[in-house]
Amino acid sequence: MNDLERYFTENTGRLIHKWKHYFAIYDRHFSRFRDTDVHVVEIGISQGGSLQMWKQYFGPKAKIFGVDINPYCKKLEEEGIEIFIGDQENRTFLKSLTQKIPKIDILIDD
């Protein structure tokens, strides 16, 4: 069991929506970014649990960004996690993100 799957399994905080078989794939591709200044963007954040999972997994140097259409999600911001409200189908909105996020190393569309 890798650290992502362990976090998911032991999580008692915010709800995380992920397919369990994704964790091995995520870990294989993302582990090299741990403890770096990685910029992660996740589109579709639901309850915000996966943003917290990414923050813990990548470490304190990481900057985690969430994108969701639901204005409620803005309330899920915390230190190290910034949330933008908008529609991923809106090209103008997506273009504006490139002005607000200095770089994107990992983009997760959930």
Where are these regions (language model features)?
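A short alpha-helical cap/connector motif
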Residues: 1-108
